[in-house]
Amino acid sequence: MTDRLAPATLVFREDGTLVSPAYGDIYHSAAGALAQAEHVFLRGNRLPERWRGRRHFTIVETGFGTGCNFLATWAAWRADPSRSERLHFVSVEKHPFSREDLRKAARHIVAGTTIDASLVDELADAWPMLTPGLHRVELDAGRVVLTLAFGDAREMLPSLVLRADAFYLDGFAPSRNAELWSVEVFRALAKLADEHASFATYTSAGDVKRALENAGFSYRKVEGFAGKRAMLVGEFAPRWKLRRHEPPRAFDADTRDAIVIGAGLAGCALVERLAARGWRVTLIDRHAELASEASGNRAGVFHPLVAIDDNFGARLSRAGYQYALSRWRAFEAAGHAFSRSREGLLQLACDEPEFVRMQAAADALGMPDELASLLSREQAGEQLGSETAQGGWFFPQGGSLDPTKLAAAACATAGERLTRLANVEVARLVPREGGGWLALDANGATLASAAVAIVANAADAPRLAGLRHAPVQQVRGQLSMLPAGSAPKVALPVIGDGYLIPFADGSALTGATYEPDDLDPIPREAGHRENLVRLAALLPHAQVDSNMLADPASLKGRVAFRCVASDRLPLAGALGDEAAAAANARALSGAQPRDLPRASGLYGAFGFGSRGFVWAWLAAELIASQLEGEPWPIERELAEAIDPARFLLRALRQGRVG
C-alpha cells in the first residue's frame, strides 16, 4: 500500500522566516528566499542561458517546500525572450503544504520582490490534492509543466522516467535530513541525468561531496549566498559506466506529425495532447461523428477507484482522474462545455460487508476529503436526496458528462493542427519507406502518411497493429433511457452495482449490462429488464414507474462495446516489435520492459473498458511525453503496468514466443 502523506505545517519565526517544526530547520535564508534561489540554483546551473533555443528543458529538484525555487525559475523563464518552448520542473516533496498554506507561504516570499503575485495564485489554484504519487500541473498556458512527486525521495526518484538537464539539490540541512543527501538519492539522480547535466546546492558538507562523487558527479566550490563561504556546483561526469538503461530521448523523426486511428475519447485526447505540443494530427474514424461507439452515450460517470491495497488499478485511476479534471477545467476556461455535473458522485455499497471494507480502506488510506469521503447510510441519503440502503463513497469532484461534447472540445483545441478523415476505415498500417507509417484503405490506397501512428480504435487495435500478444475482448453493454417522470428522483449521479444518471428534464440514464463476447448491437428487452432490476437493488427505497417495470420493451436504449484487457488495465504506450522479439526470444526471456524491441513510431491507446473518462487523458499525456522525450506523468511501475508490450514480456518469460 502507498504510504499516506503527512502535510507540512506552516510556521513563521518572528523575523518572517519560514521554519519546519518537524525538521527544526528553516525553509530559506533570512537574507531572502528568492535571492537565494537566484544565486544558488539559477546562477549555479548557468540559467537562463542553458535553456535558450531548446524545445524543452528539464529541472529536477529535491524538496519543493514553499515553491520559492520554482517561482524564481518560472519568473526568469518568462522574462527570457530566448527561453525554451517548454519548461519542465520536477520536484520531490515528502511533506507538501496544503493549497492555502502554500498560497500564504509563497505570497509571503514574493512580497516586495519583482515576481508577480499572480504566479503564486496560478500555482496555488492548480495545486493538486495531497495524495501520494506524481501530479502533473500545467501552468502558463501549458508552457510550464510542474510535475510534483509527493512521497519519500528514496522511493519517488527511482520511479521517475525523464532526462534531466539540471538539478536543484535543496531540502533541509544534511544534519537535519540526512536521507535526502545520501548516496542512494544521488545515484537515483544519476540515472536521470543527461550527459553533463548540471547541479547546484547551497551546502558544501563533506558527506555531500563524497556522496556526489560516489554517484558520478564532479563538483567545485563557489561563493555561497549571503556571506556563506561556499556552495557546490558541478555536473554529471561519471568515470565509469553507471547505467544499464539510458534515460529516454525524444522520438527521432524529421517531422512532428501523427496518424491517430479512432475518434473516441482515447483518440480525441491524443489529438489534444499532441497538438498542444505543436504536432499535426490526422484523425481517422469509420464513423461520420466523433465518439460514435463506446464513447457515444448521452452521458457517462467518472470517479477514481478505491482499494485498501492501493493497487495499480486504484493508483492509475486516481492519477488519471486528477489529471483529467485539470484538463477539463482548462477546456471549460477556454469556453467549451460538455455538461459536466457539479454535485459530486455517490458510490453506494452493495451490502453491509462491502461497507465494512470501505471503512477499512478509508482508515488505511487517509484520503483527503476533496478526493473522497465515506458517508454513512443517513449521510448518503441526505446527499442523494433519496433514502439509501447503505452508505458509501462520496466523490465531490466526480460526476457525469457528455462524452461526445468532450471529444468535440478536445478536437476544437487542436485548431488547424487537426485533419479529420471521417467515414473512412483503415484496412492496414504499413511502414513507410525511410521511416514512418502509411494508413491504407481496403484497396491499398494511402489515406494518410506520418512519422507516427497511434491505434486508438478499441478492440480492432491489435489486428491493425499486428499484435498477437494483446488479449482484449469486447464486452456488450446495454443502457436504458428512463423517460421524465418515471425515474427515481436523485440529486446527483449514483453508482454501485449499476448506475443512475439524472438529467435536468427529469429523465435519467441507467445501466449497464456486462455481456462478454456478445456482439448483438440491438437493444433487447432482457437488457432493459436487467437494468431495472439492478436499479431497484441500487435504490431499493426509491419509486420506479410500475408501467416501465411491466413493459421494459417500451424503453429506449443504446448498445456499446467496451474493450477490456485480460488484466483489466488499459494498454497505453509504445508497441512492442513482436517479430524482432520472436527472433531474439531466448535472450529476452529475462527481459525488463526497457529491454524489449519496439515498433518504431507505433503506439497504442486502447483497452479502457468502462473508464475512458479517467484513463484517456493520462494515456494521451504519457504517449505525448514519450514521443517528446519529456518527463513521464506517472511512475515507471504504473507505466509498465499499462505498457502494451506487457503481455509480450510475459510470453517471453514463459517461453511462449519464437
PLM feature spans:
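The AdoMet/dcAdoMet-binding core of the Class I SAM-like
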Residues: W51-A164, V183
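Helical element adjacent to the flavin cofactor pocket in flavoenzyme catalytic cores
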Residues: W393-A442, L447-A448, V452, A456
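Dinucleotide-binding Rossmann-like beta1-alpha1 core, especially the glycine-rich loop
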Residues: G300-Q383
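Helix-loop-beta segment of a Rossmann-like dinucleotide-binding subdomain
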Residues: T113-D116, I308-N311, A337-Q347, L371-A412, ...
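Glycine-rich FAD pyrophosphate-binding loop
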Residues: A276-G296
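Flavin-dependent oxidoreductases
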Residues: D310, G435, A439-V533, L538-K556
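C-terminal catalytic lobe of FAD-dependent flavoproteins
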Residues: S546-G658
